[in-house]
């Protein structure tokens, strides 16, 4: 039986967006995907492209008319479209600003005018900037350390203003180092987990930025899907018009990540256990440590992450081994 609720997922051909599309289609929602395929991939959509409840709009959030077309008849927006990556933003701050701020504002305006019920958007842990306090608590942020971090913080400011001024319900999800199936291992700005997995599978030595003691709150994709669903469906009025950390709530050093990857990949190829890693300089704009408090999400949204970092990593490794070999 088809669900009559219609969801727009911007950036729906990307890593997180395509996983959201697949999940909500499995729940019989009507799903519209808006993507310009600058970083997303059509192969991420193959599994459900013929689903009668799925509609693809090839467009760009930098064009207001594309946004207006995409939100027609939509109940909820899950806004994932953005140019990610701190290094990319340092190399090209103008395009990052155009997509992440101007594009975001276009989506807010289009959603407001179409009377969308709720606008859930991908915020970022980079907003915490130079704040050294751990764990990260939503109301206590530092100064941004990169153009990317600035754009994601401005998103939060715009969302807050649209909530207060126009009555548009918004919820921001500060993603912490999301990983899992469909995450692209290729390209100059590939995330660390798929990049390391691919290098190990090719029997290459991964290059670790710094001494490997930097730590991250790595978050499996299914926890992110869970948070998007909770944000979309909550009827708790205290839970809307705010931001939430979206993570597991534990941190893992890069050295430990390497250890786990070698252990899990060795189940498929024992020789991977003997591959050494190379250590290089720290990366500009990177924060040393990231650990998230998920207390607020638990209290207001009922969030209890289904996957630990290690259980999620095992699932991700299985997927990569099956799909990248």
Predicted segments with their positions:
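N-terminal Rossmann-like NAD(P)+-binding domain of SDR-like oxidoreductases, especially those catalyzing
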Residues: 1-178, 228, 289, 305, ...
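C-terminal substrate-binding subdomain of Rossmann-fold SDR/epimerase-dehydratase oxidoreductases
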Residues: 20, 201-325
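Short aromatic-enriched loop/helix-cap "lid" or pocket-rim segments at secondary-structure transitions
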Residues: 43-46, 132-134, 183-187, 221, ...
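Residues that form or immediately flank small-molecule/cofactor binding pockets and catalytic motifs
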Residues: 61, 141, 180, 213, ...
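A conserved pocket-lining segment of Rossmann-fold NAD(P)-dependent short-chain dehydrogenase/reductase
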Residues: 88-89, 139-140, 170, 174-184, ...
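Short-chain dehydrogenase/reductase
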Residues: 97, 145-156, 187-194, 218, ...
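Hydrophobic alpha-helix immediately C-terminal to the catalytic Tyr-X-X-X-Lys motif of short-chain
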Residues: 154, 158, 162, 192, ...
């Amino acid at each position: 039986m088809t669900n009559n609720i219609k969801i727009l997922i911007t950036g729906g051909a990307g890593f997180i967006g395509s996983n959201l599309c697949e999940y909500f289609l499995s729940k019989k929602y009507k799903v519209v995907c808006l993507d310009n395929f600058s970083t997303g991939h059509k192969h991420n959509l193959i599994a459900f492209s013929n689903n009668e409840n799925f509609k693809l709009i090839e467009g760009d959030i930098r064009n207001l008319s594309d946004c207006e077309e995409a939100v027609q008849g939509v109940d909820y927006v899950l806004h994932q479209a953005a140019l990610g990556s701190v290094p990319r933003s340092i190399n090209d701050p103008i395009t990052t600003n155009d997509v992440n701020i101007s594009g975001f504002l276009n989506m807010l305006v289009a959603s407001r005018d179409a009377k969308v019920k709720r606008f859930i958007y991908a915020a970022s842990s980079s907003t915490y900037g130079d704040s050294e306090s751990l764990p990260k608590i939503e109301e206590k942020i530092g100064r941004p350390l990169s153009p990317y971090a600035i754009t994601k913080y401005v998103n939060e400011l715009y969302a807050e203003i649209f909530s207060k001024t126009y009555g548009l319900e918004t919820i921001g999800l500060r993603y912490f180092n999301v990983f899992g199936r469909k995450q692209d291992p290729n390209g100059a700005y590939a995330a660390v987990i798929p990049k390391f997995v691919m290098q190990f599978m090719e029997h290459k030595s991964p290059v670790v930025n710094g001494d490997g003691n930097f730590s991250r709150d790595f978050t499996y994709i299914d926890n992110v899907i869970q948070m998007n669903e909770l944000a979309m469906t909550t009827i708790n009025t205290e839970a809307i018009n705010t931001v939430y950390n979206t993570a597991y709530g534990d941190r893992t050093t890069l050295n430990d990540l390497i250890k786990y990857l070698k252990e899990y990949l060795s189940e498929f190829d024992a020789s991977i256990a003997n591959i050494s890693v190379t250590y290089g300089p720290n990366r500009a704009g990177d924060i040393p440590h990231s650990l998230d408090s998920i207390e607020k999400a638990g209290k207001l949204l009922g969030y209890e992450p289904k996957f630990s970092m290690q259980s999620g990593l095992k699932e991700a490794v299985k997927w990569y081994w099956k799909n990248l070999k």
